[in-house]
Amino acid sequence: GPVLNPEDAQILERMLRTARSVTVRERSSLAWCRERGIDARLSVDDATDYPVASPARTLHYAEGVSAGQALDELPEHYVCVTVNECTDQQAQQIARLLDGMWREHGYAPVFLSHYGDPQDPASGDIQAHQRIAKRLRTSTPATLLPILHADQSIAVHRAAAFTLTSRYHPAVFSAAAGIPVLALVPDAFTQMRVGGALRQYGLGEFTLPLGMLAGGVPELMVAAALRHAAVASDARRTELLEVLRAERAYLLTQILASGAEKLDEVEAPAPFPTVEQVPALPEPLGATVRAARELFTETSLTAGFEWAMSDRAHSWDAEHRRQLECARAIGGYSAHGAEQTRPVTVEAYSEAPAEAHPAQPGLLARVARRLRG
């Protein structure tokens, strides 16, 4: 998701209907399931209470790359930054925001990659981080970290004073630890996931499309997030951890139960507790940003759907060409050097019966037929 063409939606629905238990991470997914009569429950991401090993596990890096020294020298107060993509203009705007956080709050930017290759230090999020870092003022100290093992990554997030991210799990780790978060959203997919995760904590308003970095809005949202974190208790976080543990216990009971009668005896967890959302901006600015966010999400979904349909068409076209080439290769040449002509049938994604042909249908065509029952 969130882009599902009709065929994909049918496949997903069949998958969920065959599951013994369905749990989702955000209310948009819950609504999708309930619209189709699927008995789903809402919970939090299973990395919310990720247990860090002791000693923390590490990755195997390419020669000359070491994360240990940088981790030992992290600043006392810092904003943890994870950005996976941005334009040059957005990189400049993010750098300006980070300069302001250093100047006003004393938070030094620490760039933490969540995607990359430990054997290729120039790959992944580090590329966007380098572009942002080189636009910082010379007076703003910055630390660039490579991709880390989850044990180390979570430790960095939990020790931060603030999190600025366009990725999902940095928001999950930080919100679970009570660290204020501002999510910079590049598309509808991220908005649904990150916004859904933050909404569980009452922080769903702290998401901002990357195209809205100008005009002082992100600075206001950072200030609001810090004010809320200064007075917030850990009651909601404790409540969500209890929800997650109850969900796991319920799933385990279902797995161990055998037979319909025993399954009926398993008591489902209590409904997911609701929470009031914390305002991120004063009104009417907050309403304006919400409307812009909704329009951005709708536009991104439309573009994503069109891309998905185009990608699907190209995929089937490539598969048809492959089958045609295989069929021609099977035809081959006769022993006398003359090409043997054989009827060729290309399997299509259609209910129409194929012409009589001794060859077996292509793999994708067989899968499609199986899914259609």
Segments (PLM) and residue ranges:
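Active-site anion-handling motifs in enzyme catalytic cores
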Residues: 1-347, 364-367, 371
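Acidic, proline-/serine-/threonine-rich low-complexity intrinsically disordered repeat tracts
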Residues: 342-360
